[in-house]
């Protein structure tokens, strides 16, 4: 009985992969050019592809066996009070952190931002983490992950180096077109060098000052020009590669972590988003937040909850995409409350630590947010369907007259951006889908797998991240799919795709001997390398052809001698444009 059952799983999973690849080929003619497409109307081909994608998800979900050897959920730890009244180092650190936070908040509310306010803000999270020292070695309360191996870390180091090389290559030439929003960030950040302002909301784009200060720090370290602005962003984007590996390893195993990191490394979308400053920090912060939170749940150790709280508190201080954490955390908490209530009641002190860490990291921004809530919310009300202008624009754009019809179009364009619809943002505007064909096909299967295992908190976390990002960054916003808004979903996407890839690998490798598995691994590496090379060539070629006149003029002027006089004589160009100023 066992052997036929395995073959049924294998046939079903491979059939699902074939359906996903066929659907992708119908939509974009990759990886296979189908002559059939030329005989079909575009709408017919799209509907057929949508049906095939849905069938692939369903078939893979049915073919996927229950996860083998799934670790049991951790038993709630015995209560170990941290807030004891005794004079201990943890109690003293917590008291100092709380007093420092209150003092900093009071100083800010009474006199505004100052060096003392910033020092107290920084001291709070550091003192809080210090309360967990010295770390006592306690065994994890669940089955631990496999022990580390040298090749695992060697592969991760190799991928991280490759990711940096791809993202730093031709750093000031790619992207070819520099959108005005990016140069505004550079101009505003340049003004903050020597005059730091970490608290509040910048009036130009209504982004947090903290976000601009990160760019100012980058330019102070690496140069007060486009190179200095971009390099800091590239370093943050590169750091997301090992962060995704860690999260994938925590949620599943090293194979999922490595494959997810590889898929993100070769992604042209992540390559671009890592360069253009605005979305890079949210990707790293949310990935680390989820990794710390899950490690805390898995091990029952409070320090990971504290770190998750600190990252959660930092999430509203960068670009808006990071605020998806404010959806992920409550929904996961609610899931635990319904299905694993003991993980709430038995670890309530750890959950309080998460809240306290978030409060400390958010710091004096709490005072600003309470005083100027509308400014803190930024452009939320201007770019969503709640804005009547946006609503009317979308009705006219789609030629519909009702909200349900509008939402159907919004959902289609958002959900299918991984397979078909191109970016609408001025910062990228890449003329193709968000994912390459390999990642897109694996994502389809990974979603089916995760939905079939939705009772598993790991799947629930990824599906929540995925769905919340698409709803908040696409369905409810103006002119989706805007990849600057939707980019926050990429870590969840590659982990979902990697889970499907590893499941397929397990089915194919099961009957093979050691040499057969090595050959299969070599084929996987070759496939990833081939897709990665094609992704880079496609991205670099597009970048050369995407340059707009304003950027071409600014690049030309920047290469002239410093004493050269330049006169602009034709609209719509003006020296007041940030592209020329920066």
What are these regions (language model features)?
Residues 1-153, 307, 328-335, 351:
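Membrane-embedded, hydrophobic transmembrane alpha-helices
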Residues 106, 287-305, 312-315:
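Membrane-interface transmembrane helices that cradle and orient dolichyl/undecaprenyl
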Residues 166, 174, 183-199, 207, ...:
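Transmembrane-lumen/periplasm boundary regions of multi-pass, lipid-linked membrane glycan transferases
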Residues 231-251, 288, 444-448, 499:
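Transmembrane-helix motifs of polytopic, lipid-linked glycan transferases
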Residues 244-266, 456-464, 517-524:
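Transmembrane-helix signature of polytopic, membrane-embedded enzymes
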Residues 269-281:
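Short acidic/glycine- and proline-prone juxtamembrane loop motifs at membrane-interface regions
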Residues 272, 321-325, 503, 507, ...:
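Catalytic lumenal/periplasmic loop and adjoining terminal transmembrane helix
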Residues 273-274, 324, 437-442, 459-509:
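Hydrophobic/aromatic-rich transmembrane helices and adjacent perimembrane loops
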């Amino acid at each position: 009985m066992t052997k036929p059952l395995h073959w049924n799983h294998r046939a079903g999973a491979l059939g699902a992969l074939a359906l996903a690849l066929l659907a992708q080929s119908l939509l974009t003619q990759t990886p296979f050019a189908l002559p059939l497409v030329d005989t079909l109307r575009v709408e017919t081909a799209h509907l057929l592809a949508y049906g095939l994608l849905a069938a692939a998800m369903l078939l893979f979900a049915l073919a996927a066996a229950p996860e083998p050897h799934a670790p049991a959920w951790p038993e709630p730890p015995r209560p170990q009070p941290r807030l004891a009244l005794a004079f201990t180092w943890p109690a003293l650190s917590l008291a100092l952190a709380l007093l420092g936070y209150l003092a900093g908040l009071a100083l800010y509310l009474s006199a505004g931002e100052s060096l003392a306010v910033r020092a107290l803000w920084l001291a709070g999270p550091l003192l809080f983490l210090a309360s967990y020292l010295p770390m006592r070695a306690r065994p994890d309360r669940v089955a631990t992950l496999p022990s580390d191996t040298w090749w695992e870390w060697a592969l991760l180091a190799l991928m991280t180096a490759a990711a940096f090389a791809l993202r730093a290559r031709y750093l000031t030439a790619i992207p070819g077109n520099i959108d005005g929003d990016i140069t505004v960030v550079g101009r505003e950040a340049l003004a903050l060098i020597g005059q730091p302002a970490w608290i509040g909301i910048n009036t130009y784009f209504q982004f947090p000052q903290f976000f601009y200060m990160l760019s100012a720090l980058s330019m102070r370290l690496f140069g007060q020009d486009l190179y200095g602005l971009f390099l800091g962003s590239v370093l943050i984007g590169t750091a997301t590669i090992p962060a995704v590996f860690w999260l994938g390893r925590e949620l599943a195993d090293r194979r999922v972590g490595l494959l997810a990191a590889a898929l993100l490394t070769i992604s042209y979308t992540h390559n671009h988003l890592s360069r253009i400053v605005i979305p890079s920090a949210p990707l790293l912060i949310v990935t680390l937040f989820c990794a710390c939170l899950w490690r805390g749940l898995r091990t029952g150790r409070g320090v990971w909850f504290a770190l998750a709280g600190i990252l959660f508190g930092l999430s509203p201080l960068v670009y808006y995409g990071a605020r998806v954490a404010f959806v992920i955390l409550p929904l996961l908490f609610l899931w635990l409350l319904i299905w694993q209530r003991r993980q709430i009641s038995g670890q309530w002190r750890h959950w309080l630590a998460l809240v306290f860490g978030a409060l400390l990291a958010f710091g004096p921004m709490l005072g600003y947010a309470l005083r100027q809530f509308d400014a803190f919310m930024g452009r939320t009300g201007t770019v969503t369907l709640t804005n009547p202008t946006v609503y009317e624009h979308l009705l006219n754009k789609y030629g519909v007259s009702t909200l349900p019809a509008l939402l159907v179009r919004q959902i289609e364009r958002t959900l299918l951006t991984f397979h078909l619809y191109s970016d609408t943002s001025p910062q990228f505007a890449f003329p193709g889908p968000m994912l390459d064909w390999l990642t897109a096909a694996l994502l389809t299967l990974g979603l089916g797998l995760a939905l079939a295992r939705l009772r598993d908190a790991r799947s629930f976390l990824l599906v929540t991240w995925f769905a919340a990002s698409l709803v908040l960054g696409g369905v409810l916003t103006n002119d989706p799919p805007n990849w600057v808004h939707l980019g926050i979903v990429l870590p969840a996407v590659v982990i979902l795709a990697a889970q499907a890839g590893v499941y397929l690998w397990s089915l194919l490798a099961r009957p093979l001997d050691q040499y057969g598995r090595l050959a299969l691994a070599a084929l996987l590496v070759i496939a990833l390398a081939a897709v990665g090379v094609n992704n880079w060539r496609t991205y670099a070629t597009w970048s050369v052809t995407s340059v707009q006149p304003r950027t071409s003029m600014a690049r030309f002027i920047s290469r002239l001698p410093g004493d050269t006089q330049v006169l602009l004589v034709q609209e719509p160009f003006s020296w007041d444009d940030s592209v020329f100023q920066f």
